Amino acid sequence: MTNRIIKKVLSALSHQALVRVMSALFFSLALMTNFAHSVEYPSGVVRIIVGFPPGNATDIVARVFAKQMSEAFNGAPFVVENMVGAAGSIGTAAVAKATPNGLTLLVGSVGTLAMNPWLIKNLPYDPAKDFVPLAQLASVPMYVTVQSTLPVNSFTDLVALAKQKPGVLNFGSSGNGSANHLIAAVVASTSSIDITHIPYKGSAPAVTDLLAGRLSLMVETAPAVLPHVKSGKLKILAVTKPTRTAILPDVLTLSESGYPGFDAQAWIGFAAPAGTPREILDVLGRTAAQVVGSKLFAAKMVELGLEPMASTSPAQFSSYLNGEIKRWGTVTERIGIVRE
């Protein structure tokens, strides 16, 4: 009797309707499978490795992100660990070599994931092969900043002064090959000015010397310089991203300052070691997208002087990262930087 009823029902269904029913069934099973995996993950403490010291922009973003990921996983522990050294490559390499079980993850930067391959000989990891990009967390606008006594009030003024005194002006950075070194070098190359690079061990001592007048300028993040701009000790002349920023909407872009299309900014991203099981990657990618897309995370990024991402996905970040690796290879070749 039951079999006859089933046959009648099936015969009454059109082929397309049957396909829709079966598709819905498989979709439901897929959701149940994903839900099961999300319940199982994480199986222990999740370590998020940062290759920079506490207080660095990458570290600060990692801590905000880790806290919100922990909340998204019902209080599961997401702990930030700083493994400092070699322009962030020590910590990054540690993640590349870690067991790919989703318990050791990376919050890296444009420096560690896109610039270091062109700066460091025998780099102990390949960012294009050793990681699975999961989410871009924030972009980090960089600002051309000068000491307040320097007689310039715009980027155009700065270029004119530098051309009047070739080699006399100098700029500081947080170290050879750092993001603010390379971006400043691109600024100088694009505007055809001759300024001398002075590397420091971190941004803090460089900003100290900028305040003291021992440096002419820096290309730095808002968190590092904005307090001193507000106090009148520093001046911001331009931002290196293609659009103005929410935190400093009156600051001109370099595109608006005579260099159309100029775009050289830092960013921070989230990745897992290659070989991590697909179901874990899916859970991490989906949850990271929810965190990064939340109003809470976006508000915190703006508060820090960073630019939140409107949307992000593993595929988007992977495509962006591959483009950035190629772009910075071209840039380092153009400005004459060789691997050391």
Enumerate the language-model features and the residues they cover.
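Bacterial N-terminal signal peptides
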Residues: 19-34
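N-terminal (or domain-start) structured segment
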Residues: 37-129, 168, 176, 192-221, ...
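Short beta-strand->loop
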Residues: 126-136, 172, 194-198, 216-217, ...
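N-terminal secretory signal peptides that target proteins for export/translocation
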Residues: 1-17
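Hinge/capping helix and adjacent helix->loop/strand transition within the periplasmic-binding protein
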Residues: 97-104, 110, 118-205, 254, ...
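An extracytoplasmic/periplasmic, membrane-proximal ligand-sensing/linker region
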Residues: 43-45, 230, 278-340
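Short hydrophobic alpha-helices and adjacent helix-cap/hinge residues
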Residues: 9, 37-40, 68-72, 121, ...
